[in-house]
Amino acid sequence: MSDKKYNVDEGEIAKFSRIADKWWDKSGEFKTLHDINPLRLDYIDGHADLRGKRVLDVGCGGGILAESMARRGAAFVKGIDMAEQSLETARLHAALNNVADIEYECIRVEDLAEAEPHSFDVVTCMEMMEHVPDPAAIVRACANLVKPDGMVFFSTINKNPKSYLHLIVAAEYLLKFVPKGTHDWKKFIAPAELARMCRQAGLDVADTKGMTYHVLSQTYALCDSTDVNYMFACRPAF
C-alpha cells in the first residue's frame, strides 16, 4: 500500500486550503493564475487539440485550467488535487456554470497512475511542481498516465536570481500580486533539471517556451527566455 502522505507538503495544503474560497476571484489572491490561464490554455490546445480528448489536470486547485479545457472542447476532464477545500470550490463553480464532463478527486497523482495507467490523451501539471517535495515523482506519474500517443504539459519556475527577484521580491513583497509565502525559491526548478526528470521518466521534450508578464496590460505572452516562468510540451519517448 502506498504512503498517502508521501510527496505531500502539509504546509502547502494548509496554505491553499485557507484561501480556497478565493480561487475564482479574478482580482484576488489567484489573479496571476487567471492572467496566465488564456496563454497556457492556447499553448496546450495548440499542441494537443483538446477537442474530444480525455484530459487530466494535476494539481488543479479550484479548477481554473480544468474548467477552461472542458469549455475548449475536451470530451472529459478530470482534475486532481490534495486540497479538498479547493476541490469543493471547483465542483461548485462547475455546477453553477453548467460545465459538464468534468470531475474532481482528492488523490495523489502517483496513486492515480497505479489505478489508471495510460488512460489520458492529455496530462497537464501547471504551476504545481514547485509546491511538492519530490517533483521527479510527479513527472514519472504523469508519464505513466498519458497514452502512448498523448501529450504531457508542465509549467513551473526557473531557479536563479532573476526568478527570486521577480516572483518573490517583486510579486510577493513589492507589487503584492500574490500573498507572501506563496513561493519557496528552494523549490524552483531549472529547465535543465526538469528536462532530465522528463528523460528519466520516458518523455521527450517537444517544445519549450518562456512566459513574460506585461504589467500595463496585465497579460502574459510567450517568449524565448525561460529565465522565470516556462512551459514544456512533452511526448512519450516509447
UniProtKB/Swiss-Prot annotation:
GO biological process, one term: methylation
Entry keyword annotation includes Methyltransferase: yes
Annotated catalysed reactions: a 3-demethylubiquinol + S-adenosyl-L-methionine = a ubiquinol + S-adenosyl-L-homocysteine + H(+); a 3-(all-trans-polyprenyl)benzene-1,2-diol + S-adenosyl-L-methionine = a 2-methoxy-6-(all-trans-polyprenyl)phenol + S-adenosyl-L-homocysteine + H(+)
InterPro entries according to UniProt: SAM-dependent_MTases_sf (IPR029063), UbiG_MeTrfase (IPR010233)
Keyword Transferase: yes
Known pathway: Cofactor biosynthesis; ubiquinone biosynthesis
Keywords, comma-separated and alphabetical: Methyltransferase, S-adenosyl-L-methionine, Transferase, Ubiquinone biosynthesis
Entry's EC annotation: 2.1.1.222, 2.1.1.64
One Pfam family it belongs to: Methyltransf_23
Residues annotated for S-adenosyl-L-methionine binding in this entry: R40, G59, D81, M126
Gene3D superfamilies, A to Z: Vaccinia Virus protein VP39 (3.40.50.150)
Molecular-function annotations in GO: 2-polyprenyl-6-hydroxyphenol methylase activity; 3-demethylubiquinol 3-O-methyltransferase activity; polyprenyldihydroxybenzoate methyltransferase activity
Family indicated by similarity: Belongs to the methyltransferase superfamily. UbiG/COQ3 family.
Record HAMAP family: UbiG
Primary role: O-methyltransferase that catalyzes the 2 O-methylation steps in the ubiquinone biosynthetic pathway.
Record-given protein name: Ubiquinone biosynthesis O-methyltransferase
